[in-house]
Amino acid sequence: MKILIKNGRIIDPASGTDNVADLLIENGLVTGINKDISREKTEKVIDATGKVVCPGFIDLHVHLREPGFEGKETIESGCKAAAAGGFTSICPMPNTNPAADCLPVIDFIKNTATKVSLIRVLPIAAITKGRKGQELSPMGELAEAGVVGFSDDGDYVSSSSLLLNALLYSRTFDLPIMEHCEDACLAEGGLMNEGLLACRLGLKGITNATEEIAVNRDIALAKESGGRLHLCHISTAGSVELVRQAKAAGIRVSAEVTPHHLTLTEAEVNGYNTSAKVNPPLRTQTDIEALIAGLKDGTIDAIATDHAPHTRNDKLCEFGLAANGISGLETALASLMGLVHSGKLSLSLLIEKLTLGPQQVLGEKYQNIGNLKAGSCADVVIFDPDEEWTVDTAKFFSKGKNTPLEGRKLKGRVKTTIACGQIVYQQA
Amino acid sequence: MTHIPKTPADTETLLSEVQGWKHRHVLDLDNFSREELDMVMQTAGVMLDILSRPVKKVPALKGKTIATLFYEPSTRTRSSFELAAKSLSADVLNLNVSQSSISKGESLLDTLDTLESLGADMVVMRHPLSGAPYLAANNCHANIINAGDGWHAHPSQALLDIFTILRHKSSLEGLKITLIGDIKHSRVAHSNIWGLSKMGAKITLCAPYTLLPEGLNTNSKIFPEVTLETDIKQAVSGADVVMGLRLQRERQQSGLLPGIREYARYFQLNEEILKLAKPNSLVMHPGPVNEDIELSQSVVHGEQSVINEQVKNGVAVRMALFYLCSGSKEI
């Protein structure tokens, strides 16, 4: 099967490409970028005039909820949502039930994804058995089964000695430990960002130190162990600075940030809006500026959605009882394009943080994705950077309709997603 | 200035002056204007008169059902609302739900559905989780009156506090009002900060730093007249009103205080400290008082204490809220 994408603005941060040209896909691989590639013998021609053509996005952090919480999301609905958001590779977190801490669960996830056959699903396994923070999971076996990293996401590994061992042991298999950084004592009972608004709403605040203490400890352990540390969803200016210093000191640390922490502030919580309840909490404009600066200077490697779908009832309750999380796959690009349209981020840097950046966190093994080099996997997204649309969660592929962006007008829309040379999404 | 009617004709005149009420619910005082606070005060004045008549009842809400839904134990507030409803001839349905049953299994919205099916026109609710009345107001038809939610708000208490002060002072404009106690976790304090500052008072908040909302210091745009103070002598000095807050024992358990005795040593309002306030100053407390902890016994029962008046005025203020939210024009 040959697909020819004509006349799009091709942006490939891996090769520094940014020009209007045609892109040819043959047998699931990118085979060429050139001006005026002939239409001959191509089964499918896509006119991408005025559109951006770039590598399919890679999301290091999603929750697919299966097995165990199929009411919130399934591997199938999550993959469809990802495809609609322009993502061609996603890394589901292991906080399923049972937890993805052993071969059978990882195999189940991979087999189900194969049956769904839409996009690449690269599972992350638990650091500890049952995500209980006590004993290491069988990391060697899990690495062999193809997991891309280890995380007890949702919980912090409280024991410093256990995390040190996790970093040392996973280093044996050259896989990252992906930490959810949150000091458990400080976090207890916390519901939103600490500050005047938390006081006004009578909600217990989560201080910046809650995250920064954990980031600091983990960086110290990464230094000591020589292991690979990846920090999930950092949210504060202080965390950005800690990562910046660690990188300058040559410590093997990488970091991701979510679209919501880059675009929304704690003000979304006003009126006890549970769709804006998320952990780490939405912070302040100062933090947003620092996170953007971190993307620009390379401190932050990747943008990851932390797509966290929930049922209606999980959110339609008292703020204190509501589940944490935002369903983010289908609004990620458009909300981030707001930063491009307002001049805060360049389009090529944004694409880099959704493609090359996360690919580098995954490592050399995955260098055939996240770029449009000849011979790379034909994962491609075509989007209109200027099309305006209104978020309507009723039209989400995700079962999770939980987003504070419902009803909001965004600018930038995914038109076509191609994964391994197959068209997996076309905007109606 | 509170207006207490002197004749039945006064009652009608005073009530007819109250126009433009737009609140269906009373959730917090943050969205109340100065004019709306005045409306409550004027209406409560009429209600206080009704309560002092030989027949303490008017038919304003006859045929209406008011439910009280309390997820926290309360005697005073619930009784006050019940009496207020009955004085307006409403039927009252009391529902006490144990705090332990707050779970997603027996949801607040299910319970409210049931109350509405039973015909409740208004629901007075108290809930340990901040914002619960907002969930209720957004998802049901009844008028919701917040009788205290978590650390967030207790609007009727703040309104009765303002009403009580106005029974003794011609205006709140420029008065120094000092609140002492666990400001950070007190819904009474939070609603009072909104209400008192809209009435033009200068507010001083006094507590150790673990119980002080420091965020208030950094955003003077919203509350320009709020001062934080850790020294009780400074805080009380020259005050027109001193309000103690109930110290919850759990604050010690959660590590915010080393102990009750130490708290009393540094933050108890006693006779000696009260002398630093203006001679005609008022001592207030939302009740129930932990005597000899936040207030010394002599201050609770002293001449300047208006704590019992607060209780009495509470019924009138709650009648006013029911009356205004119901849209009734009869009295």
Swiss-Prot record, chain B:
Pathway: Pyrimidine metabolism; UMP biosynthesis via de novo pathway; (S)-dihydroorotate from bicarbonate: step 2/3. It comes from Dehalococcoides mccartyi (strain CBDB1). It is an enzyme of class 2 (transferase). L-aspartate binds at residues 104, 187, 246. Keywords: Pyrimidine biosynthesis, Transferase. This is Aspartate carbamoyltransferase catalytic subunit. It comes from the Bacteria. Carbamoyl phosphate binds at residues 76-77, 126, 154, 157, 287-288. One of its GO terms (molecular function) is aspartate carbamoyltransferase activity. InterPro entries: Asp/Orn_carbamoyltranf_P-bd, Asp/Orn_carbamoylTrfase, Asp/Orn_carbamoylTrfase_sf, Asp_carbamoyltransf, Asp_carbamoyltransf_Asp/Orn-bd. GO terms for cellular component: cytosol. Heterododecamer (2C3:3R2) of six catalytic PyrB chains organized as two trimers (C3), and six regulatory PyrI chains organized as three dimers (R2). One of its GO terms (biological process) is 'de novo' UMP biosynthetic process. The keyword 4Fe-4S does not apply. Belongs to the aspartate/ornithine carbamoyltransferase superfamily. ATCase family. It catalyses: carbamoyl phosphate + L-aspartate = N-carbamoyl-L-aspartate + phosphate + H(+). Its EC number is 2.1.3.2. Pfam families: OTCace, OTCace_N. Catalyzes the condensation of carbamoyl phosphate and aspartate to form carbamoyl aspartate and inorganic phosphate, the committed step in the de novo pyrimidine nucleotide biosynthesis pathway.
